[in-house]
Design a protein with these regions (language model features):
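A sensor for short, sequence-defined functional sites
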Residues: 1-222
């Protein structure tokens, strides 16, 4: 139209479309928990999250709750900070609680490794006829600290892995120190169009990442 102009959104390197979650999880001997979270999303990841600012406060909490792979979760406090600059970002700071962080069997607690990747999906296995489209690349980093309940020790941890593929990379580390478990998950997905014949390799990569996200930690009562 006359007097109008068309603006093209800038293209950013995949590695700049980031989401970083820092979480501290305090666990009780009965699998109750309190969780402190700081989550910041930038650029295209910001665009995925920015709609939350238009919701009513109770709906905002519902949205956050829906992203957690955690039953009986309650969002006790939520603060949202939106930064509309050349490199926009949105930050969620919240406290969550649950009466059931994992489950207890006898003298053992089985707890999740990462509750923040509920939305990570593995496509179904099919005979692929069309190319695989990854529309935008991104980088996710989850840094999680789990404080062990009194009287419990670690009996089993998921094995850390390093995956490298043409679709992206994944790194996990997990270790214990001073009665705490430290977990880092780093996922990088690369934008691109891939041949149908590469679908099996794509599925295998996603499955291995999902296994890490869905891993279980075993705690045993001393």
């Amino acid at each position: 139209p006359a007097g109008g102009s068309i603006h093209r959104l800038p293209m950013y390197p995949d590695s700049l479309n980031t989401q970083h979650i820092i979480a501290t999880i305090t666990l009780s001997p009965t699998a109750e928990t309190q969780i402190e979270v700081n989550e910041i999303s930038r650029l295209f990841q910001y665009e995925n999250e920015a709609g939350i600012v238009y919701l009513e406060p109770n709906k905002q909490k519902d949205h956050i709750r829906s992203t957690l792979n955690l039953s009986q979760a309650d969002i006790l406090r939520l603060q949202i900070k939106e930064c509309k600059e050349a490199n926009p970002s949105i930050t969620f700071s919240y406290t969550a609680s649950s009466q059931q962080y994992g489950y207890k069997t006898g003298n053992r607690l089985f707890i999740p490794t990462n509750i923040f990747k509920k939305g990570f999906s593995v496509p179904r296995a099919i005979s692929r006829k069309y190319p695989i489209h990854i529309n935008y690349g991104y980088s996710d980093t989850d840094s999680i600290c789990i404080k062990l309940p009194d009287g419990y020790i670690v009996e089993g941890l998921p094995k850390p892995i390093d995956l490298k593929s043409k679709f992206g990379n994944f790194h996990s580390s997990i270790y214990t120190k001073d009665n705490k478990i430290y977990i880092v998950h780093q996922l990088f997905m690369r934008k691109g169009v891939y041949k149908p014949g590469e679908y099996t390799a794509f599925l295998d990569f996603r499955k291995q990442v999902a296994e890490q996200y869905n891993g279980k930690i075993i705690l045993k009562k001393e």
